Design a protein with these regions (language model features):
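Mid-domain alpha/beta scaffold segments of enzyme catalytic cores
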Residues: 1-271
Length: 271
């Protein structure tokens, strides 16, 4: 598998590794056959770092965005111009990580399920980033947790099909998957599907069209089932692909090639 160099990881956060560790992580990814990694920002600082990392590593691409967890912050006027400039960088191939998250944040203690102001702030920030993505013809890398009933209507209202995109770490149901696919969005799967209780996701993977699938690790988060460490990394995308191939009962090499094409088509890359 390592010799093919066709594996792709649509969603990681390389800025979360110390610099020396990140370099080791990228070397292991290359050795495992990973051709492309997209590192996503969550705010202005991490988006700038994503662009910096991508500019310094030929196998890394950048995605810039405002994560729903920070969407309620008051951003000064100059912030928007700085963000727009990052989105225009040559190594920037997508807008993300953007979206909606109505699940209470255990890290910050912020509750969303009963806080209408925070939910509206997320929706407003999301709509603004969809508009920018459409303007710059950049696909969206969408984060969605506990908000699938709101996601599709917003994408439809904002005509997000003009930009297209991928819902990373998809956790919705079959009906929600169909709606997103009908709008031209792809669904990305990662470590979650490796767990024995992920039967609903595995069923969705089995039925959706092959041209609607992408693979991710969300490194350094979302470790795989029975992984030896708590910290995930892009090299593990090889195992995710093998599990998807097993679920779909298809040849692993054929699946890798198909996902590689999906990745290139979404991000407008040359094969």
């Amino acid at each position: 598998m390592a010799g093919e160099s066709k594996l792709t990881d649509i969603h990681v956060h390389l800025d979360q590794y110390p610099r020396e560790e990140m370099e080791q992580v990228l070397r292991r990814a290359h050795k495992s056959g990973v051709r492309w990694v997209v590192t996503s920002g969550m705010d202005l600082e991490s988006s700038a770092r994503a662009v910096e990392i991508a500019a310094a590593n030929e196998r890394v691409l950048a995605s810039v965005g405002i994560h729903p967890w920070v969407a309620a912050e008051n951003f000064p006027a100059e912030f928007h111009e700085k963000f727009r400039n990052l989105a225009r960088e040559n190594v920037t191939v997508a807008m993300g990580e953007v979206g909606l998250d109505f699940v209470d944040n255990v890290f910050s203690g912020v509750t969303y399920h009963d806080n209408q102001d925070l939910r509206e702030a997320q929706e407003q920030a999301f709509r603004g980033q969809i508009e920018l993505a459409c303007e710059l013809t950049l696909p969206l890398i969408v984060h969605c947790r506990g908000a699938y009933s709101s996601l599709a209507p917003i994408l439809k209202e904002e005509k997000a099909y003009r930009a297209r995109g991928v819902v990373h770490n998809f956790e919705g149901d079959e009906r929600q998957a169909s709606k997103l696919l009908d709008m031209g969005f792809l669904l990305s799967f990662g470590g979650t599907i490796t767990y024995p209780d992920a039967t609903e996701l595995q069923r969705i993977i089995r039925y959706i069209p092959l041209d609607g699938i992408l693979i991710e690790t969300d490194s350094p988060y979302m470790p795989l089932h029975l992984q030896s460490t708590d910290k995930n990394e892009p090299a593990n995308v090889a195992r995710v692909v093998q599990i998807v191939a097993k679920i779909r009962e298809v040849d692993t090499k054929e699946l890798i090639s198909a996902i590689y094409n999906n990745f290139n088509n979404l991000l407008n890359l040359k094969a």
